[in-house]
Amino acid sequence: MSNIEKGHEHQMHSDADSREFLSFVLGDEHYALDIMSVKEIRGYEKVTKIANAPAFIKGVINLRGDIVPIVDLRLKFNVGEATYNEFTIVIMLNVAQRIVGIVVDAVSDVIRLADDEIRPPPEFGVAFDSRYLLGLVAIEDHMVILVNIERLISSDELGLIEQQTETVQD
């Protein structure tokens, strides 16, 4: 059985007791987020830098008239090298009625998970704050970290992004 077929074993649940997640890779780790927050997946493009922004906020882009902040999760989670080339991926998300782009190394698959497959997040042993986690799930021979994207791109950070993108538009 191929790796893709094994991954789809998790999709045997009815729609009522499961949710779909988009899985992606950062460094050597596998992550996933609720697919309902995904707007589109794009290649990385040049950003307009924002003065005094945290290092993980790379800047903003103009996406069909919307000014969209770009957050590099590799820097936010402190995993992997932050290189930007034609293979760099940006996942555009709808978070708190705002479009935000997140930079990842690769997008893997869509996985359907039942609530009982999701294990609670550990209080230690991960590279970032466990408040950003929905939980963990074992798929094939690795663990997938489920990210709470609304909490990760917190209202405080979105407020900072909002304030600085207004400055860019002026």
Identify the residue ranges that each predicted region occupies:
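An acidic, low-aromatic, low-complexity terminal/linker signal
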Residues: 1-170
